[in-house]
UniProtKB/Swiss-Prot annotation:
Residues 1-68, 307-347 are annotated as: Disordered. This is Presenilin-1. It is found in: Endoplasmic reticulum; Endoplasmic reticulum membrane; Golgi apparatus membrane; Cytoplasmic granule. Residues 105-133, 191-195, 243-249, 413-418, 465-478 are lumenal. Residues 30-40 have a biased composition (Basic and acidic residues). It comes from Bos taurus.
C-alpha cells in the first residue's frame, strides 16, 4: 500500500469526524468514494510525473509505429530478395523445358497417353473431343486429390517412414529411369555416340548424388539444381503424354483446386502446413523448393562442466539467457589440465572488488535482463538468415513448366506465345509473393500465375499472332 497524499489524508480525517453519527453503510459509501478519489489522484499524479519526466503519453504509440515501419522495411527487403531467388529457379525450369521441346522431337510426338487419361482426343466431332477432355481432366484431378489426401493422412498420423519410402521411390524413378530416357533422346537428337557402360556410370552417379542431396544432406545449390531438374523431367512427361485440350483443362481446374486446398479451413494442403507448423517441423525436401536450406543442423549444446567453470565468480553471466550458446576457446588438453588456474579471463576477485568499490555492486534488474535477452535474440536472428526462406511446392514448378511447354509445342510454333506465357507466369508469381508479404500466411502459388498464363496464351495465339501475321503480309509497320 502506498501512502496517501497530504490533501487527501486531511480530507479523510475531516470527513470521518463529521460523520461519526452515520451508520456503517454511509461509512462504506464514503470509503468507496475515497478509494475512487484515491485512484483518480494516483492517475493524475502518474500523468504529472510522466509529463514532468519529458515523456509524452503518446510515446508508446510512436514506438509501436516505429516497430511497424521496421517490420515493413524488413518485409520489403526480404520480399524483393526472395522474389529474385524464386524467379531464377522458375526461369531455369521453364528454360530447360522449352529448350527440350524445341530441340528434342521425342517430347512432341504423340506416342500414347497416361493411364489416368484413357479417353483419346482423336474424335470426329468437337463435342466428343470436349467430352473426352473433360472426362480425362476429372480422372486426373481425382487422382491428384486422392494422393494429396493420402499424404495428409499419413503425415497427420506420423507415418513418416511410409512417406519417405513413397518419396524415395518417386525420386528413384525420376533420377534413374526418366533421366535415362531423357539422356538417350538428347544423344539421339544430337547424334552423340555413347556406349551403355558409360551411360550406366553417368546415370548412376547422377542418381546417387541426387538422392543424397535431396533426401539427406548436401550443398544448397546442388539440392536446388536437382529439384529443378526433376521438376523439368516430370513436366516433360506431362507435356508428352497429356492430350492438348486435356492439358489446358487440367491447368485451369488445378489452379481452382489449389485455391480451395490451401485457403479452405479443411483444405488438405492447409491442414498439411498447419500440422507442420504445430509440430515445428519442416516439410519434406522432396516436396518443397526452398530459397534457403531445408534441412537444419541444430547447434550442439555446450559442456555443462565447462559452462560452470566459465560462469564461476561472474555476476554478468547471471544476466545471460539460459538458451544462449557458450563459446569457449582453447584446445581440449588445455581444458583438461588440472594445474591450470581457473579460467576467469583476467577478471579476478580483486578486480571485481575494485570495480565494485568504484561503481558500486553490479546487480541485475528486470530491465537489464530484458535488454540482454532482446540483444541476444536479435543476434541469433541475424546469425540465422537462412531460416527466412520462401518455399514453393514442386508441383508449382511442374505446372508452370507444363503451361509454357504446351504453349511452345502446340502454339503455331512461334516464340511470341511462349514468351507471353513466360512473362505472365513471372508476373503472377510476383503478385503471389506480394500477397504473401501482405497476409503473411501460406498462399496458393498456382491460381494467379496459371490464370495469367492461360489468358496470355489464348489472347496471343488467337489475337496477337494473327494480327502480326496480317501486318507482315501487308507490310504495315507500327
Amino acid at each position: 500500500m502506498t501512502e496517501l497524499p497530504a490533501p487527501l489524508s486531511y480530507f479523510q480525517n475531516a470527513q470521518m469526524s463529521e460523520d461519526n453519527h452515520l451508520s456503517n453503510t454511509v461509512r462504506s459509501q464514503n470509503d468507496s468514494r475515497e478509494r475512487h478519489e484515491h485512484g483518480n489522484e494516483r492517475r493524475r499524479r502518474g500523468n504529472t510525473e510522466s509529463v514532468s519526466n519529458g515523456r509524452a503519453p503518446s510515446s508508446s504509440q510512436q514506438v509501436v509505429e516505429q516497430e511497424e515501419e521496421e517490420d515493413e522495411e524488413l518485409t520489403l527487403k526480404y520480399g524483393a530478395k526472395h522474389v529474385i531467388m524464386l524467379f531464377v529457379p522458375v526461369t531455369l525450369c521453364m528454360v530447360v523445358v522449352v529448350a527440350t521441346i524445341k530441340s528434342v522431337s521425342f517430347y512432341t510426338r504423340k506416342d500414347g497417353q497416361l493411364i489416368y487419361t484413357p479417353f483419346t482426343e482423336d474424335t470426329e466431332t468437337v463435342a466428343q473431343r470436349a467430352l473426352h477432355s473433360i472426362l480425362n481432366a476429372v480422372i486426373m484431378i481425382s487422382v491428384i486429390v486422392i494422393m494429396t489426401i493420402l499424404l495428409v493422412v499419413l503425415y497427420k498420423y506420423r507415418c513418416y517412414k511410409v512417406i519417405h519410402a513413397w518419396l524415395i521411390v518417386s525420386s528413384l524413378l525420376l533420377l534413374f529411369f526418366f533421366s535415362f530416357i531423357y539422356l538417350g533422346e538428347v544423344f539421339k537428337t544430337y547424334n552423340v555416340a555413347m556406349d551403355y557402360i558409360s551411360v550406366a556410370l553417368l546415370i548412376w552417379n547422377f542418381g546417387v548424388v541426387g538422392m543424397i542431396a535431396i533426401h539427406w544432406k548436401g550443398p544448397l545449390r546442388l539440392q536446388q539444381a536437382y529439384l529443378i531438374m526433376i521438376s523439368a523431367l516430370m513436366a516433360l512427361v506431362f507435356i508428352k503424354y497429356l492430350p492438348e485440350w486435356t492439358a489446358w483443362l487440367i491447368l485451369a481446374v488445378i489452379s481452382v483446386y489449389d485455391l480451395v486446398a490451401v485457403l479452405c479451413p479443411k483444405g488438405p494442403l492447409r491442414m498439411l502446413v498447419e500440422t507442420a507448423q504445430e509440430r515445428n517441423e519442416t516439410l519434406f525436401p522432396a516436396l518443397i523448393y526452398s530459397s534457403t536450406m531445408v534441412w537444419l543442423v541444430n547447434m550442439a549444446e555446450g559442456d555443462p562442466e565447462a559452462q560452470r567453470k566459465v560462469s564461476k565468480n561472474s555476476n554478468y553471466n547471471a544476466q545471460r539467457p539460459a538458451n544462449s550458446p557458450v563459446t569457449t576457446t582453447g584446445t581440449e588438453s588445455e581444458s583438461q589440465d588440472p594445474v591450470t588456474e581457473s579460467d576467469d579471463g583476467g577478471f579476478s576477485e580483486e578486480w571485481e572488488a575494485q570495480r565494485d568499490s568504484r561503481l558500486g555492486p553490479h546487480h541485475s534488474t528486470a530491465e537489464s535482463r530484458s535488454a540482454v535477452q532482446d540483444l541476444s535474440s536479435s543476434i541469433l536472428a541475424s546469425e540465422d538468415p537462412e531460416e527466412r526462406g520462401v518455399k514453393l511446392g514442386l508441383g508449382d514448378f511442374i505446372f508452370y513448366s507444363v503451361l509454357v511447354g504446351k504453349a511452345s509445342a502446340t502454339a503455331s510454333g512461334d516464340w511470341n506465345t511462349t514468351i507471353a506465357c513466360f512473362v505472365a507466369i513471372l508476373i503472377g508469381l510476383c503478385l503471389t509473393l506480394l500477397l504473401l508479404a501482405i497476409f503473411k500466411k501460406a498462399l496458393p502459388a498456382l491460381p494467379v500465375s496459371i490464370t495469367f498464363g492461360l489468358i496470355f496464351y489464348f489472347a496471343t495465339d488467337y489475337l496477337v499472332q494473327p494480327f502480326m501475321d496480317q501486318l507482315a503480309f501487308h507490310q504495315f509497320y507500327i
